[in-house]
């Protein structure tokens, strides 16, 4: 099975880390790819790509620069993404597309409007990572949320995320507590006990 994780950029972030941890899992018969929507350019980007490649995850870099100046650039990326995704679909034929955060959500929604027939055999999964979706963008939310609800694609990462989603959009999302690797707590030698 071929699974594609779509993230905003190859950079440091909670959703990016969850996608990376899932993609790096050594699940038998699973081929993982990770696709960035906007090109990451931080000091962490190269480390992220190296980590993915060492784990056998195929990385698909974006040509669209990540400009943090205004949300309009994410909208442009979403409009242009269907052409890039067309190539990915025709070349790789993913069985599952797993989106993380609003920018990838917009991109797959846009792709589904242009090329719905290419998604007929592909399962869409969407992880909701936070309690506030589409802050300041209610018109975009009113277009995109019904798509993910209709496709039964939503998965929340916590009770609070799922409760917030149900309160705002009226739909239930199952909870899956995965994608976060367990880290052993280190003892801090200078801790003062009182």
Language model feature labels by segment:
Residues 2, 95-96:
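Structural motif
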Residues 5-75, 166:
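N-terminal strand-loop element at the rim of the active site
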Residues 73, 89, 118-155, 163-169:
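A conserved, positively charged/aromatic
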Residues 89, 93-95:
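Proline-aspartate-enriched helix->loop->beta-strand connector
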Residues 160, 179:
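Carbohydrate-associated surface elements
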